[in-house]
Every structure is written in structure tokens, then in C-alpha cells.
Amino acid sequence: MGHTITEKIIADHAGKKEVFPGELVTAKIDLAMANDVTAPLSIKTLEKYGIEKVFDKDKIALVLSHFVPAKDIKSAEQAKIVRDFAKKHNIKWFFGEGEGIEHTLLPENGIVVPGDLVVGADSHTCTYGGIGAFSTGVGSTDLAYAMATGEIWLKVPESMKFIFYGKLNKWVSGKDLILYTIGQIGVDGALYRAMEFDGEAIRSLDVSQRLTIANMAIEAGGKSGIISPDEKTIEYVEKRAKKPYKIYQSDKDAHYVEVYEWDASSIEPMVAWPYLPSNVHPVSESTHITIDQAFIGSCTNGRIEDLRIAASILKGKKVHPYTRCVVIPASKNVYLQALHEGLVDIFIEAGCAVSTSTCGPCLGGHMGILAKGERCISTSNRNFPGRMGHPQSEAYLANPAVVAASAVLGRIAHPEEVASEVLV
């Protein structure tokens, strides 16, 4: 019997010829990552046990992303803990205020490459599967262990396969495919499983949209999300890679506990209603819902490709007078590129508030928090009660085109209702 891409990556990092689902292994990691929310606990854990050295300063990434620039004294102190630790240990991949969100920065800068095994103290670490890495979120104490030893103990996950055949409709993106998937299987439909995506529609997506799909695997309970590399992946990685990489592919006779096949041409832009990412409805069934805020950004959809799509909708238009729109590029490089292309001009002229790179309102951090009773349509990845502010606020999830169109009309809208000439 053959093996999946996930099993092959884990086997190589565990020093084994092969591994099987359910097997417990200790695997070498290529990168350990934490942010300003999760790293302080990892650092305190290392200090508690008297661990003076990290296993490899070049294989640790620390990113100040969630509450930056610091919104209060507590968040400033959290950032200082991380900054001081990075300086003390000469951590190679330390990113300070304004550099961006970790899940955008690491692929963008070639720090994560295909075939890597990455653990991060953030649930959306699964993002890197979009370029063919096995990456998964862990707790801060597990992350401390990884930082000290360069290893992680884990159970080999079962794999599920999701095949999207056919061609995508206009305005349908990777965000819609993953929302559709979660809507079909539920928030626990892939519990501790590797979610592997393939098919004609998946292969038509650029790397940015593949990262979006992998990013939201955790919203179905997945241990990871992964798309095997192809020519598009290699083209993306070759421009960025800071180290050698290895391409893995699933065997044709690999075993999957479940296989789903869907016709992508039957899918329209999707919207996840409160209060679960699985509460998915077509945008055509959502246009009666008024909104107070639109948010374009996050590690899910804050890359340059996302901003281009949003700008193509907003060009020459104005945000609805009773709606606010917050745009946050997911990294400094994305911000600079958006400036160079004139996208920031479009956003500001439309009436958007454009912020330095940060997670912002996605997690209810700052720069766009919702009041009681307010509704936001967002390009981010979660819509639990209180996720973006007050427990009695509401968050709706959608792709950048839908969010931008909604900002113009003050209600959830199909992009065709307000579309300008597409910039991409």
C-alpha cells in the first residue's frame, strides 16, 4: 500500500522508512514558530525548567503580529518578553511591529518550503500546507519543548481527500472552496485528520489561494491542510526559498479514510454566517443582511492578490456612508506592493481605513473591534461569538470580492452588483 504526502513527510522527519495513521512518533522539526500572544508562555516554560539554549536559533521564528503596535500596557509587555528573548538568543527569524502576520511572512520570505515539518503555537499554522509542507498548531508548552529539542511528539493523522473537478465560476476563489468544504463536513468533520486537496479546480488556483485553503483546515478540525506541489508551487518557491526543499507526492494507491468529490462549477461565492465557519450559505441567499463593518485582511486573505481583487471592486466607488471598511495588508511587503500598484490610493479614496500590518480585528485584538449588536463581513477565518469584539456582535466570512462589494452597498452583496474592471 502506498502512502500520502503527509505520511511521507512525517516518516522522513521521524527517521523511518514509513509510518501509518495512529502511530506515535518523535519527529525532527524544520521550524518552530510563535507570536506575541503564545511565545511568552513558551519562554516562561523554558525559564521555569532552566533551559538556557534553544536547539537552533536559525530554526525558530518569533513574530509580533497579534497586538501590534501595542494597544495597551499588557500587550506591550508581552511584546517586550518576545523581543528580549529574540535578542538574547540571536533568533534569526524575528519579526517586529509592522512586519506582518506569521502565516503570510514565512512562505512569502521562503522560510517555510515544501517538505518542511513545521510546528507553531498558533492554530492556523496549517497554512503552510498550501505549498506542500506538513504544518500544524501546538500549544505553547509543546512549542517550548520543540524550541529546546528540535523535536515534536505526535500521532500520525489519518488523511482525507477533497477533489474539486471542473472550472471555477467568476468571483469564486479558494476561500469559497474551503468554506464549501467546511459547510459540507462540519467543524469536526476532519478532526485530527490531514485534509488533502486536489483536482482541476485546485490546480487552477495560484499559491495565494492554496494558502487560504490550507489556512482554514483547522476550522474543520483538521490536524493539517495540504496541497501537493506542482509547477505553480515550484515557481513560487524558487523565487523565495532560503534553503533546499524536497517535493513529496501522494502515491496513487495511498489510503484515505474518506474521499469527497465536488463539481467546482456548481459553487458560487459563499458566506459563513454566525456563529460557526460551517454555517455556510451562498451569497445569493445572504444579500438581505446589512453590515456595519467590512474587514479585508488577516492571514487568510490579506495577501497582494486579495488586495488587488478588493481594489478592483472599490475602484471609483465609495464605502457606504453607514458602513466602515478596514483594510490591513498581511505583511509589510504586501503593503509596499499595494502602495506601488496604487491599491492603497484606491482604498483611501473609497473611504477605507488602511492600517499597518497586524492581525487587527480578526481575533478581536484592535483596529476594528465590534460593538454590541454590530455586524462585520470579513475575509478572516473565524466567526465564533465574540471573535471580533462584543459577544453579541456578528461576523460573516467571505472572499475579498464579496467583502469589498458589501462595503459599497452596506449589506452582503455579490461582486457582480458593483464590479468594476478586474485588475488581475
Swiss-Prot record:
Q: Which reaction does it catalyse?
A: (2R,3S)-3-isopropylmalate = (2S)-2-isopropylmalate
Q: Which PANTHER family match?
A: 3-ISOPROPYLMALATE DEHYDRATASE LARGE SUBUNIT 2 (PTHR43822:SF16), HOMOACONITASE, MITOCHONDRIAL-RELATED (PTHR43822)
Q: What does this protein do?
A: Catalyzes the isomerization between 2-isopropylmalate and 3-isopropylmalate, via the formation of 2-isopropylmaleate.
**How is its cofactor bound, per UniProt?**
Binds 1 [4Fe-4S] cluster per subunit.
Taxonomic classification: Bacteria, Pseudomonadati, Aquificota, Aquificia, Aquificales
Q: Quick one: which residues bind [4Fe-4S] cluster?
A: 299, 359, 362
Matches recorded under InterPro entries: Acnase/IPM_dHydase_lsu_aba_1/3, Acoase/IPM_deHydtase_lsu_aba, Aconitase_4Fe-4S_BS, Aconitase_4Fe-4S_dom, HAcnase/IPMdehydase_lsu_prok, Homoacnase/IPMdehydase_lsu, IPM_dehydratase_rel_enz, IPMI_cat
Q: Which cofactor does it need?
A: [4Fe-4S] cluster
Q: How does it assemble?
A: Heterodimer of LeuC and LeuD.
Q: What class of enzyme is it?
A: lyase
Give GO terms: molecular function aspect only. Answer: 3-isopropylmalate dehydratase activity; 4 iron, 4 sulfur cluster binding; metal ion binding
- Pathway the protein contributes to: Amino-acid biosynthesis; L-leucine biosynthesis; L-leucine from 3-methyl-2-oxobutanoate: step 2/4
> EC annotation?
4.2.1.33
What processes in GO biological process is this protein linked to?
Answer: L-leucine biosynthetic process
Please name the source species.
Answer: Hydrogenobaculum sp. (strain Y04AAS1)
Protein family according to the UniProt entry: Belongs to the aconitase/IPM isomerase family. LeuC type 2 subfamily.
* Keywords tagged on the record: 4Fe-4S, Amino-acid biosynthesis, Branched-chain amino acid biosynthesis, Iron, Iron-sulfur, Leucine biosynthesis, Lyase, Metal-binding
* Protein name according to UniProt: 3-isopropylmalate dehydratase large subunit
Matching entries from SUPFAM superfamilies are given as: Aconitase iron-sulfur domain (SSF53732)
